[in-house]
Structure formats: C-alpha cells, structure tokens
Amino acid sequence: MTDTTRSLRDCLAPAKLNLFLHITGRRPDGYHALQSVFQLLDWGDRLHFTLRDDGKVSRVTDVPGVPEESDLVVRAASLLKAHAGATLGVDIEIDKRLPMGAGLGGGSSDAATTLLALNRLWRLDLPRTTLQSLAVKLGADVPFFVFGKNAFAEGIGEALQAVELPARWFLVVTPRVHVPTAAIFSEKSLTRDSKPITITDFLAQCGIDAGWPDSFGRNDMQPVVTSKYAEVAKVVEWFYNLTPARMTGSGASVFAAFKSKADAEAAQAKLPAGWNSAVAESMSEHPLFAFAS
C-alpha cells in the first residue's frame, strides 16, 4: 500500500470465509439469527483513493453489473462524508479480483476498506465503533471487515468477538454460478433451528492450539445450495475424497484448509481444467486495522 497526503493506493479489501455457519432462529424483524466464525484471507480486491477538493465522491472505474450510485464503495464514502461533515471528496478506483456472488464478502469488504481508508485520508479520526455503526447500514458483513479481526459472529453478523485462529492456507474454488443470498434464506427447506453454541465450544476444537475448522459444525445453507446448483454440488463432491471442504456464506465458493502453501497448491493442481480457483493465506488482522482506534 502507498500512503501519501493526497492518495492511498493498493488498499487490500480482503476476502472472508465462514468456517462454519449455523442458523439458530428467525428474529422478530424477519432477519435470520446466525452464528459463524469469520476468517480473513490475504486475497481480495485492490482499491485506490485520491482526494478531490470539490467535495465529490466518484467511482472512476467501471464495475460490470454494478451502477455507480448503487455501488457499496460509493454509498460507504457518501455515508461517511455526510456523518462527519467532510468537505473533501474522493476518486475511487477498484481493481476487482474476487468473484461476485461467491460468499467471499467482496462488496462488503470493499465498503469497509473505503470507510477505513477515508477515515485516514480525510483525517476524520473516527473511532472504530463509529465506523462499525455506519457499516451496519451498508450490509450485514461490512461491520466484520471494519472490526478487522477474525471473529466469532452472532445476531445478523454484527455481534463480534475476536478469536485467534491457527495460521493456514486455503484452496478456494468458485463455480461459475451466482447464488442469490435472499433466495436461499427464503427456502422452506433451510435449517433454521440449529442449537446455539458458545465461543468456548468452537475454540476448544478449532482455536489456535487446537484443530482445523472443518472439524467443527457445518454450513446450514450448503444442503439447500447444492440441491439447487449442480455446479456447487460438483465441487463439494470433487473435494470429498481428497480433504474435508465446506461452502462459505451462501456460496458459491467452496474451500478447504491446508497446513502449507505447497499442500494447497498440490490440491489445486489436481482440479479439473477450467475450474476457477485461488490459493490464499489466512490473515489475523485487516491490513487497514490501524486506520481506526
């Protein structure tokens, strides 16, 4: 990342994985109550921010299928500007590297990186808790990325406790299909009554001194998605005889954990030709964590 008084370049918006995802109920407001552990990855979109003196917020790169006015990065910048009364504007460039609609948190991570970067570039010095309260207005996953640590999440994903996780490498395979989250949540067959667990339950099996994430829990959305999207089911089936694997979020990405980069790349080399995949290392902290206190 390059940090000057007028710009911030090569800001990573990291991907996330849901190491497990349990749906424990439905809230009075209609949202589903969730429990999950979010894992940051050293892989994601790259964002570039350049100050404008005219106060305008502008996205200067085209993102296919995402109009500028509805882009979460533009909404995040505009929300922060209005909240803080900032007089400066910004040009935002986005180098999209994460597949969209894949359960990796791409758009939400872009929004969080925007909040953190502009907190520094606009010299707002807002505390992290304030940025998180703004993040909630942008989407359920955005507060986690502002929180900036691997986390045990509850509620709709906004109640977060930091967790220490063992370092590892992941192979992430993304079928070329878009899975609509809202449609999966509305499916009658979706499990909505998983027994709530505690952070202690998780850490006993999967903490920094314990085992691997695939040994704990499940993704309650996975059976619904694999029943409707043969492409996702095919990836899960491919992994079956090699190593435990799991879908992240509402899909479509499927991941497996490995102890080394070499092990992950060896598995990647066995993938069928044409499959979209990436090998990524775990991260313990968001690269812009220091941009809020």
Swiss-Prot record:
Keyword Methyltransferase belongs to the record: no
Active site: 16, 141
Catalytic activity, EC: 2.7.1.148
Superkingdom of origin: Bacteria
Gene3D superfamilies linked: 3.30.230.10, GHMP kinase, C-terminal domain
Residues that, per the record, bind ATP: 99-109
Role played: Catalyzes the phosphorylation of the position 2 hydroxy group of 4-diphosphocytidyl-2C-methyl-D-erythritol.
Identification of the protein by name: 4-diphosphocytidyl-2-C-methyl-D-erythritol kinase
UniProt organism field: Burkholderia pseudomallei (strain 668)
The encoding gene: ispE
